[in-house]
Amino acid sequence: MHALQAKILDPRIGNEFPLPAYATPGSAGLDLRAMLKEDTVLEPGQTLLIPTGLSIYVGDPGLAALILPRSGLGHKHGIVLGNLVGLIDSDYQGELMVSCWNRGQTAFNIAVGERIAQLVLVPVVQAHFELVEEFDETQRGAGGFGHSGSH
């Protein structure tokens, strides 16, 4: 297991609300909580930047963190991330913020401390460009959207 340095920026974490933890041995994500000053209503079509009360430092350039939506919020309530995925670079040290978007048709109440997103560590491979005049030919070639089937 990789050690992830974290700072608690909101004193309610660790007291009123638990530190992020894996729910099961097979869990990939750590739940992030909405550390708002008060319960907030997110109207249809509205976006809101929500503090998590945590900052992290991954430190290893071979890793990055992703902030992803919680599947139940998106499926049941239309609550997703405003930027779809939040990418946290290994050298970022600021507070984790969640861009929350209500794409649903009804207002959604976000309670203080509610689990609003999840944090997942992923491996990163950095690449450099090797400039070429032509690519080796492949069966697909430059075929793009819809090229490999009718849907």
Curated annotation (Swiss-Prot):
A Gene Ontology biological process term: dUTP catabolic process
Keyword Transmembrane attributed: no
EC nos: 3.6.1.23
Pfam families from the UniProt entry: dUTPase
CDD domains in the record: trimeric_dUTPase (cd07557)
Keyword Transmembrane listed: no
GO molecular function: dUTP diphosphatase activity; magnesium ion binding
UniProt entry keywords in alphabetical sequence: Hydrolase, Magnesium, Metal-binding, Nucleotide metabolism
Catalytic activity reported: dUTP + H2O = dUMP + diphosphate + H(+)
InterPro entries associated with the record: dUTPase (IPR008181), dUTPase-like (IPR029054), dUTPase-like_sf (IPR036157), dUTPase_trimeric (IPR033704)
Protein's pathway: Pyrimidine metabolism; dUMP biosynthesis; dUMP from dCTP (dUTP route): step 2/2
Enzymatic class: hydrolase
Chain sites annotated for binding substrate: R70, S71, G72, N83, L87, I88, D89, M97
Cofactor: Mg(2+)
Gene3D superfamilies the record matches: 2.70.40.10
Domain of life: Bacteria
Task of the protein: This enzyme is involved in nucleotide metabolism: it produces dUMP, the immediate precursor of thymidine nucleotides and it decreases the intracellular concentration of dUTP so that uracil cannot be incorporated into DNA.
Protein family according to the UniProt entry: Belongs to the dUTPase family.
Name of this protein: Deoxyuridine 5'-triphosphate nucleotidohydrolase
Source species of the chain: Pseudomonas fluorescens (strain SBW25)
Gene: dut
